[in-house]
């Protein structure tokens, strides 16, 4: 069943007296429960596409349809690279925030909050404020909140980009464990091919500006995956090199513009 349908989408921005063609003719279907990573050179329009899906930006032309199965659920939740937590709320209050806004029963909010705090290993830090947390802990709060909201789709914009390698691997595996349980439809932006290979059912590669989808690769490796398995698998190495070459050529084009 299709969860997200994008038809002939283009986006132009006006900057001073010039047009910037950020996205061009994007047509795409994402299935219910699919984990899709979006890769592409800097400035190719990845965040713009995510913002359109989050209804923070309107397409210039074309349509976006998110297939809503439950009207009581939010359509989407977003996780950003940084600053996604509310500084004056505790860890627990941050995770519960979306649920409280929907006026759900206190017992339900408490149970869901507790569940996701445990999933990301933050139960004993529940009373801390964001300024008392490390970068990795803050991202865990954002992930817990996004999943606790139980949205129709999850939009993640380089959520691990600011973390050190070790923390990144741990959070990637935690995210996969929660995703495998919930089977949310996820659209995840990354600059890392390794990250995309580890996480995705499918990788979409975008061209240099104006952003178009130039490659759509199914990643069929069995789950659960680990970075060690991904790096030692010959098929994954082949896909890595293929995407690497194409990405390099798109990055070079960006530099020539
Ligand atoms: N509100 C805006 N007004 C004008 N131009 C914009 C606006 N938002 C984005 N752009 C332009 O649209 C293009 C795509 O930007 P976007 O942030 O979507 O790219 P990106 O692929 O996410 O980049 P990065 O990988 O560096 O985060 C860029 O040229 C950017 O300058």
Language-model segments: what does each one mean?
Residues 39-41:
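The feature captures the beta-strand-to-loop junction immediately N-terminal to the Walker
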Residues 54:
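Helix-to-loop junction immediately C-terminal to a conserved catalytic motif
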Residues 62-72:
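Conserved ABC transporter NBD signature motif
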Residues 92-100, 110, 114, 218:
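Short helical segment in ABC ATPase nucleotide-binding domains corresponding to the A-loop/adjacent helical element
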Residues 128-131, 149:
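Conserved signature/switch motifs of ABC ATPase nucleotide-binding domains
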Residues 154-157:
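Catalytic Walker B motif of ABC-type/P-loop ATPase nucleotide-binding domains
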């Amino acid at each position: 069943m299709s969860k997200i349908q994008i038809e002939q989408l283009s986006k132009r921005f006006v900057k001073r007296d010039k047009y910037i063609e950020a996205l061009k003719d994007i047509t795409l279907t994402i299935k219910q429960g699919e984990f899709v990573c979006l890769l592409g050179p800097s400035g190719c329009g990845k965040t713009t596409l995510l913002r359109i899906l989050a209804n923070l930006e309107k397409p210039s032309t074309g349509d976006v349809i998110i297939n809503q199965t439950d009207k009581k659920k939010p359509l989407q939740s977003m996780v950003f690279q940084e600053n996604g937590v509310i500084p004056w709320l505790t860890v627990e209050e941050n995770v519960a925030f979306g649920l409280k806004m929907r006026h759900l029963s206190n017992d339900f909010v408490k149970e869901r909050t507790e569940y996701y705090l445990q999933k990301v290993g933050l139960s004993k830090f529940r009373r801390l404020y964001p300024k008392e947390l490390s970068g990795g802990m803050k991202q865990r709060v954002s992930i817990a909140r996004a999943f606790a909201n139980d949205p129709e789709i999850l939009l993640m914009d380089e959520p691990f980009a600011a973390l050190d390698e070790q923390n990144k691997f741990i959070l990637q595996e935690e995210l996969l464990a929660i995703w495998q349980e919930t089977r949310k439809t996820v659209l995840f932006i990354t600059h890392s091919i390794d990250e995309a290979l580890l996480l995705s059912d499918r990788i979409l590669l975008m061209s240099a500006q104006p952003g178009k989808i130039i490659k759509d690769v199914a990643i069929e490796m069995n789950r659960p995956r680990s970075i060690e398995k991904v790096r030692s698998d010959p098929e994954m190495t082949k896909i890595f090199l293929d995407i690497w070459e194409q990405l390099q050529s798109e990055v070079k084009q960006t530099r020539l513009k």
